[in-house]
Structure formats: structure tokens, C-alpha cells
UniProtKB/Swiss-Prot annotation:
Species for this entry: Paramecium tetraurelia
Gene Ontology cellular component annotations, sorted alphabetically: GET complex
Record's protein name: ATPase ASNA1 homolog 2
UniProt superkingdom: Eukaryota
Keywords carried by this UniProt record: ATP-binding, Cytoplasm, Endoplasmic reticulum, Hydrolase, Metal-binding, Nucleotide-binding, Transport, Zinc
Length: 325
């Protein structure tokens, strides 16, 4: 298969693109360059960093925060940096605010929500997806955190479903408890009404997650691009990523291999490293023979700013083969 990302650019139905891999392999550079290519093709594009150690600001050489901001010098491109692991106290959970006037009730319901591991992050992720979808971008690109964090992020819809089932069970237990202490919670009718309001909000959030989950499993709308370098640990993480995404039924058929050294007669160390890399490159080409495997040479300078990204963009579209050592 052609060793470029042209197949991604030529797919008109794509809506969501996730870019991920091991830390320090060039995910942000790759995702930012891809976002630049889409924006230049005329698509209204946003790139969102979900990595707590954000690098988009450095990559675009522009201050980027928690709200979408237009990238200077590139039409149709916006960016934002978010933390999917929001502090529950700052998260707009569909629970307490506006429903309960009694502090004891608020406290108990807060405990009920927090008793489900990962439910706050799942709801935060759902809120993010819902808000991004409402922004009406043609394409959303996620510059994700290192592999383990990303896999957990992509598994949030399953967490949400399990969490909601547990909350429903706790709900009836909590209602039985409330009936024994009506003086604390007010009348049973008032409490039931408040609980129904809360769970109506949660069900709405579940619907959002379900919709997002369906889109993520639609290969015509969503794809994942793996990024790695030609070293053992990175190759191992890439295979783990491919296996997990396959289990989640999320499409992945592109892998970008960064920092590839080409032989240089004037540099013995470069040649030694290139020889070591070739072993892993050959293995990856063989393992992913049904993937678009893009080989990206090690850059002389740090890829930063619009000019640096434009050069990197060109390389993503130029086919290169494994260097002969």
C-alpha cells in the first residue's frame, strides 16, 4: 500500500481522526501537520490536544488554551488544549447544581456519583465530544496522550454504560434509605422528583456517549493513526495499540514512523543507528503489510512554527522506502 497519508486526505467522509502512540515519538508534529494539510484543502478543521503535557502551543508557536483559537497564518484551522481528566468539582456533572437545596442531600449524591470509578472522566469526555460536535467543524483531529491514557479515553463509552448501570442500582438503595429519613431529605415525592431529574440528565449524557461511540466505530467517519519510532519499545506499544483498537472496533490502517536515519558516509554513529533501526523497520513493514506505513526521516531542526510544519507536511505525502544500510 502507498507509504503516504494521501489516503486520509482523499477520504471525504472522515469526521474524527485520532493520532497516538508512545510518548516522545512525534505525535503532536504529525497531527499538527495533518491538520494543516486538511485546512489547506479547504476543510474547516480543529485540532484538540488531550495530552495533559500539551505541546500544541509550542508546535504552532502560538498560545493555545481551553477554548478554540484560530491558528495564525493558516486559514480554516483552529486549535485547543483540554484536560479530559477534569477535577470533578469543576465538572458540570448532571447531578447536584440546581436540584438540591439541602447540603446533606448534595453530599450524599456526590458520594453516589464518585463511587463509580471513571464516571467523572467519562462524562467529561462526553461533554467534550458533544460540544465539539456542536461547533460544526468539517474535521476534528485529536492529538492524544501516550498509549495507555489514550486507550482508556477510547474506552470511556464502555465505562459510562457500566457506571450508569451501577448508579441505577445505587439509586434504588438510596431511595430506600431516603424513605427511612424523610426529615433529612424532605418528602418522598420531592426526593423522587429530584432523583428523576438527575437521572434524566445522566441518560441524556449516555445518549451523547452512545452516539459518539457509534461514530468512533464507523470506519467511514473515524480512523486512528499510529505514530512510532523504529525502536523496540515503540514498536511494541504500536502493536499493543493496534490490537486494542481492533478490539474496540476502531479503524486503524495508517502508521507513521518518525526519526528514521538514512546512511551517511561521514557519520559512523548515524550508520550504526541506521543499521539498528533497519531491523525494526523491516519487521514493521512485514507486520503491517496491509497498512499505509509512512517513513519520515529524522529532521535536522526542531519542527516548530508554520514554516517547519509545512515542510513536514510535504514529507507526509512523499513516499519513502526503508533505507538500505
Amino acid at each position: 500500500m502507498e507509504p503516504t497519508l494521501k489516503n486520509i486526505l482523499e477520504n471525504p467522509s472522515l469526521k474524527w481522526i485520532f493520532v497516538g502512540g508512545k510518548g516522545g515519538v512525534g505525535k503532536t508534529t504529525t497531527s499538527s501537520s495533518l491538520a494543516t494539510l486538511f485546512a489547506k484543502s479547504g476543510k474547516k478543521t480543529i485540532i484538540i490536544s488531550t495530552d495533559p503535557a500539551h505541546n500544541l502551543s509550542d508546535c504552532f508557536d502560538q498560545k493555545i488554551g481551553g477554548q478554540p483559537i484560530l491558528i495564525k497564518g493558516i486559514d480554516n484551522l483552529s486549535a485547543m488544549e483540554i484536560d479530559p481528566t477534569v477535577d470533578p468539582d469543576k465538572l458540570k456533572l448532571p447531578t447536584l447544581q440546581g436540584f438540591m437545596n439541602d447540603q446533606a442531600t448534595k453530599s450524599l449524591l456526590s458520594e453516589l456519583i464518585s463511587s463509580v470509578p471513571g464516571i467523572d472522566e467519562a462524562m467529561s469526555f462526553a461533554e467534550l465530544m458533544n460540544s465539539v460536535d456542536e461547533m460544526k467543524y468539517d474535521l476534528i483531529i485529536f492529538d492524544t496522550a501516550p498509549t495507555g491514557h489514550t486507550l482508556r479515553l477510547l474506552n470511556f463509552p464502555n465505562i459510562m454504560e457500566k457506571g450508569l448501570n451501577k448508579l441505577v442500582q445505587l439509586r434504588y438503595n438510596f431511595q430506600n434509605l431516603a424513605s427511612q429519613f424523610q426529615g433529612l431529605f424532605g418528602s418522598q415525592e420531592e426526593f423522587d422528583q429530584q432523583m428523576n431529574q438527575m437521572f434524566s440528565k445522566i441518560e441524556t449524557m449516555k445518549d451523547t456517549v452512545t452516539k459518539v461511540n457509534a461514530q468512533m466505530k464507523d470506519k467511514n467517519k473515524t480512523t486512528f493513526i499510529g505514530v512510532c519510532i523504529p525502536e523496540f519499545l515503540s514498536m511494541y506499544e504500536t502493536e499493543r495499540l493496534v490490537q486494542e483498537l481492533t478490539k474496540f472496533k476502531i479503524d486503524i490502517h495508517n502508521i507513521v514512523i518518525n526519526q528514521v536515519l538514512f546512511p551517511d558516509d561521514q557519520c559512523k554513529m548515524c550508520n550504526a543507528r541506521a543499521k539498528m533501526q533497519k531491523k525494526y523497520l523491516d519487521q514493521m513493514i512485514d507486520l503491517y503489510d496491509d497498512f499505509h506505513v509512512v517513513i519520515m526521516p529524522l529532521q535536522e531542526n526542531e519542527v516548530r512554527g508554520i514554516d517547519g510544519l509545512k515542510q513536514f507536511c510535504e514529507l507526509l505525502l512523499k513516499p519513502k522506502t526503508v533505507p538500505q544500510v
